[in-house]
Amino acid sequence: MDGLPGRALGAACLLMLAVGSLGPGVWGSPTPPPLPAAPQPPPPPPGAPGGSQDTCTSCGGFRRPEELGRVDGDFLEAVKRHILNRLQMRGRPNITHAVPKAAMVTALRKLHAGKVREDGRVEIPHLDGHASPGADGQERVSEIISFAETDGLASSRVRLYFFISNEGNQNLFVVQASLWLYLKLLPYVLEKGGRRKVRVKVYGQEQGPGDRWAAVEKRVDLKRSGWHTFPLTEPIQALFSRGERRLSLDVQCDSCRELAVVPVFVDPGEESHRPFVVVQARLGDSRHRIRKRGLECDGRTNLCCRQQFFIDFRLIGWNDWIIAPTGYYGNYCEGSCPAYLAGVPGSASSFHTAVVNQYRMRGLNPGTVNSCCIPTKLSTMSMLYFDDEYNIVKRDVPNMIVEECGCA
């Protein structure tokens, strides 16, 4: 942590854990719930005027933004790095042009994933910045929505391209995947009560020339215009297994022209009917869970406790790619750690070992290094966001919210 400003040491200390407890660099909520009274400032670090030997040396430089009088740039960057780390992204997506709102709204509605308010904000159940109910300790399922691009060539067979995010993991297991295609009926004379029956064939296309294979074939009886789904679980699982992300599909509709049925592909006048692929995938992740109960900061104790704070994605300029929630309660840990509070097991002790080793490398005596107030329990939060390929990703992100704090 050499070279970091003193006021960023608290955030740097906690970033070594890659968890959700960062210094409260940014907060602010449209309608945040009332928070407990602000706790007393933690004791200054050893060696500083009024310093105490009960203070964790490695975290002693931490100061809250209300003490700094302004939003600190180091804390802001620490918050950003932490979010990207939890999403397994190297940097924020480069959003040069937005996905058409009509296409996004249609996809969300068809999946019953949420609704769009009149002001354009997306409301998703359980995506309110709090912990996801029942998410911890279970297999997490990511939901990825990828919109189609096309080669623009007019023919009975149209090739669609999808760039599907694998969420930074090569061992994703595809639970279910499907192509959503809108079939529009044009005026046509039919017998009373008759239906238009067409056969839609979807072919997968490998990277090599001529490597085409049948993915799915489906007979569709049409009475009105509407959406239809075509299963693609196995082809997309094979795509992920090869470490690839680009999915090429040839779509062919027999008898569509004769029966005045028009599959809607990529048409600027039909953005709300743009084809999309939905992938539900899971990644098993066994994590050691710590159930030690911690204190809430209420202004009446200087001991290690959890302090609430709200990170507003608009204030850090990330509301263009994070669709929901508008922010989240990251929370952080602060307070003193007397000797009798030390000894939290699991990740806490591992973290303490890392801190002690850092001081050994600096030639300091680890016997003088006391316990740190750090997260001992973290929870999962659901997020909906764009990735680099303009996929809409709905994901349960682990270790985002600090639930309890302890000493180690």
From Swiss-Prot:
* Segment forming the signal sequence: 1-28
Task: Please give the residue ranges the record annotates as the region Disordered.
Answer: 29-60
> Which GO biological process annotations does it have?
activin receptor signaling pathway; cellular response to insulin stimulus; cellular response to starvation; fat cell differentiation; negative regulation of follicle-stimulating hormone secretion; negative regulation of hepatocyte growth factor production; negative regulation of insulin secretion; positive regulation of follicle-stimulating hormone secretion
Propeptide stretches in the record: 29-293
Give the subcellular location.
Secreted
Does Signal count among this protein's keywords?
Answer: yes
Pfam families (UniProt xref): TGF_beta, TGFb_propeptide
List of glycosylated residues: N94
The UniProt entry, under PANTHER family, shows: INHIBIN BETA B CHAIN, TGF-BETA FAMILY
Q: What is this protein called?
A: Inhibin beta B chain
User: What is the organism field in this record?
Assistant: Bos taurus (Bovine)
